[in-house]
């Protein structure tokens, strides 16, 4: 989900930042980073230092972590995390024996995740900049690489605008908003399918907002 400026509404891949938004983003970048501690469902503790522009682990992170742990040890299988944010789920998967790749549209998230992974002897995790979005933003291999994965997961954007936390800046708020004209779930599934990056026996885990019902999700998957 590549966010940025656009010349017209038809080409828009994300919200246009106002001068106030840019100023707020710069102020947050100057502020002191937060020390964040998070406990995974299996009891493991993770400690990270996050700038105010990177989404911290929350309840939705814990929910997705539970689903990932149910898949069992990675045993060398490949997984891709889209929108890695803090990088904590990628690190958890690495500790579970997965060969991990990850991507994010936020360069600050990439820097934070790389730093945490390096400090936890997981610098073999591959992190790329980018994510699902219009073809004009680049091809899928830009953010997925050329590998085929046994698992692809994403804690997808679904937070309502009035639920944003002051911890976040405009860049990360943009990453939490589904602005795709066809719906980000549909777009992501289509790009995963057409690019053939998920093995035929692979698993995809995507969190979605409460506004989706089961029939709608089944219809999207069937397409």
Please report, for each region that a protein language model flagged, where it lies by residue.
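Conserved Class I SAM-dependent methyltransferase catalytic core
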Residues: 183-223
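Glycine-rich, phosphate-binding/catalytic loops in enzymes
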Residues: 96, 168-172, 222
């Amino acid at each position: 989900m590549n966010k940025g400026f656009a010349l017209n509404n038809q080409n828009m891949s994300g919200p246009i930042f106002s001068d106030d938004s840019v100023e707020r983003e710069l102020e947050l970048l100057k502020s002191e980073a937060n020390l964040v501690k998070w406990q995974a469902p299996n009891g493991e503790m993770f400690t990270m230092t996050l700038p105010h522009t990177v989404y911290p682990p929350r309840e939705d992170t814990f929910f997705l972590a539970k689903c990932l742990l149910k898949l069992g040890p990675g045993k060398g299988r490949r997984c891709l995390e889209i929108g890695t944010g803090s990088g904590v789920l990628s690190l958890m998967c690495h500790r579970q024996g997965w060969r991990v790749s990850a991507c994010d549209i936020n360069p600050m998230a990439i820097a934070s995740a790389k730093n945490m992974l390096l400090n936890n002897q997981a610098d073999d995790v591959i992190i790329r900049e980018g994510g699902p979005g219009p073809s004009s933003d680049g091809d899928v291999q830009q953010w997925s690489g050329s590998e085929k994965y046994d698992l692809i997961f994403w804690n997808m954007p679904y937070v309502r605008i009035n639920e944003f936390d002051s911890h976040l800046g405009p860049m990360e708020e943009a990453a939490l908003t589904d602005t795709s004209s066809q719906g980000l779930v549909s777009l992501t599934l289509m790009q995963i399918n057409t690019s053939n990056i998920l093995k035929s026996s692979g698993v995809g885990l995507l969190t979605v907002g409460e506004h989706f019902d089961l029939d709608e999700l089944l219809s999207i998957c069937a397409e």
